[in-house]
C-alpha cells in the first residue's frame, strides 16, 4: 500500500479547520483570523509589518484581515511614528484564549487512540521531518500572565 504524508496532512488540516471554525464561529471569527489573533496575543504591540512577515501573508490579505479585526473590535491599531502597533482588545483577549486553547483541545480529540509514549514518538518524528523544534512555544499550552 502506497501512503503519502501529504494525504494525512490534508486529512488533519480539514479536520482541524472544521473543528476550529465551529469554535471560532461562536465568537464571530473565521479560520483566516485564527493566526493573526494568536500572533498579536503572543506579540502585543507588534506592527502590521511584523505580523505579515511572521505569518508569511500577502500584504493585501494582511491589510484586509487586520482592518476587519479592528472594525469588529478584536484588535486595536495605534499609530506610533510611521507604524501602526497592534494589540488585542478585551474582545480580542477572549478570542485569543479560545483560539489558543482550540489547538490543544483538537489535539486531545485527534490523538485519543494513542497512549502518551506514542504521542511523544509522533511529535518527535514530526519535529524531525519538519525541521522544527519539538519543544517550541507552539507545542506548549499558553500560560496567561
Segments from the language model and where they lie:
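N-terminal leader segment of winged-helix/HTH proteins
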Residues: 1-27, 74, 85, 94, ...
Amino acid at each position: 500500500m502506497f501512503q503519502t504524508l501529504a494525504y494525512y496532512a490534508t486529512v488533519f488540516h480539514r479536520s482541524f479547520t472544521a473543528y476550529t471554525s465551529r469554535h471560532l464561529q461562536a465568537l464571530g471569527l473565521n479560520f483566516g483570523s485564527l493566526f493573526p489573533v494568536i500572533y498579536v496575543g503572543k506579540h502585543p504591540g507588534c506592527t502590521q509589518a511584523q505580523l505579515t512577515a511572521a505569518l508569511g501573508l500577502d500584504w493585501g490579505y494582511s491589510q484586509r484581515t487586520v482592518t476587519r479585526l479592528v472594525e469588529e473590535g478584536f484588535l486595536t491599531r495605534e499609530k506610533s511614528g510611521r507604524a501602526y502597533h497592534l494589540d488585542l482588545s478585551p474582545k480580542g483577549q477572549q478570542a485569543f484564549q479560545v483560539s489558543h486553547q482550540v489547538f490543544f483541545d483538537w489535539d486531545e480529540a485527534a490523538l485519543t487512540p494513542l497512549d502518551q509514549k506514542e504521542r511523544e514518538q509522533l511529535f518527535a518524528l514530526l519535529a524531525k521531518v519538519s525541521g522544527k523544534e519539538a519543544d517550541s512555544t507552539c507545542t506548549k499550552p499558553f500560560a496567561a500572565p
